Swiss-Prot record:
Gene Ontology annotations of biological process type: polysaccharide biosynthetic process
Keywords assigned by UniProt, alphabetized: Exopolysaccharide synthesis, Plasmid
Official protein name in the record: Protein SyrA
Protein function: Increases exopolysaccharide abundance.
Superkingdom per UniProt: Bacteria
Cross-referenced Pfam families: SyrA (PF11089)
Amino acid sequence: MSFRFVCLILWLLLCASSLAIYFALQPCPGFIVTTLACLLLFQLAYFGSVLLLVCLAAIAQLSARLRIFGIFSENRNHSSK
């Protein structure tokens, strides 16, 4: 999934939730605050998912490096018996 597609989906969700709140509550002072709160939640969810992907990529890269050096391998020989 490309970055532009994710941004488009987040923008559409924000607009849809804003319109739903607007028509459900009619114009009230909390409309702008609620919209900004939804935007903040979407941004936090996106940041969390990107952070998770970065951590998973770092773990995969570290395990690949350890396999190269022979520190971590699934079929290590234990010759100390």
